[in-house]
Amino acid sequence: MYRRSGRSLVACAIVVALAVPLARVAAQESFYKGKTIRLIVGLAPGGGFDIYSRVIARHMGKHIAGNPILVVDNMPGAASLLAANFNYKAAKPDGLTIGNFVGGLVFQQMLGLPGVEFDGLKFEYLGVPAQDNFMIGVAKSTGITSIEQWKASGTLIKIGGVAPGGGTDDIPKILKATLGLPLQMVSGYKGTGPVRLAFNAGEVQGVCNSLESFKATWRSEMERGEVNILVQANLKPHPDVPHVPWAPDLAKSDDAK
């Protein structure tokens, strides 16, 4: 969660709020009372970013002096780069606009990639909704139930993605290069919500998504057994899926790991 430098928000933690001088709290209450905060989401409705943002919007105003209303505004495009650029260039730095976009965009700025029009050092960072634990899941209809079977069969699976710079695209590409996975990226969807629709329509047969988003927004597909999670690509194996192999354990060389 990000916003431009400007009037600061009271932290949600009660202990922090109590430490704020009363005069400052009164000033913030006067400013935010009756106001609306715009929460810009860089991806389409129906995905994990959207769900997190709507839950935050429902509760966050109760923890800000003055109890402003939070309104979610989806602004998908280029793996949330459009929203990040808007937050930096167009949104007024007055404490009434917050952005929720892919954190990996900061690395795009560091690498000097085209399209980045913001300076990540000039955002004020409020926090993150969750630590994403990325997994690749494929359709049951492919007949693929394990990473070993997938590699041995050579079955080309189309993976739905959003755009370079996000985990939906970058992680499958890395796993293709390091593990030799036979996959083809089909990028350009506005978020994992539209990817899920494409998955159900048979346009793509797989997705790289966070485990948290799989549980929240792909619940029906998971409960019906329509998705087989084959590999996890996290900093460490996730305890909720001990049966799913961890990508570094599958790598055959130190460079791949």
PLM segments and residue spans:
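Bacterial N-terminal signal peptides that target proteins for export
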Residues: 2-12
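Bacterial N-terminal signal peptides
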Residues: 11-21
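Immediate post-signal peptide segment of exported/extracytoplasmic ligand-binding proteins
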Residues: 25-39, 65-68, 91-97, 144, ...
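Extracytoplasmic "Venus flytrap"
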Residues: 39-53, 76-79, 160-167
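Signal peptide-proximal N-terminal region
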Residues: 58-70
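Hinge/capping helix and adjacent helix->loop/strand transition within the periplasmic-binding protein
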Residues: 62, 86-97, 105-201, 249-257
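Paired acidic/hydrophobic, glycine-rich loop segments that form the ligand-binding mouth/hinge
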Residues: 94-101, 205-211, 229-231
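C-terminal lobe and pocket-closing loops
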Residues: 131, 217-257
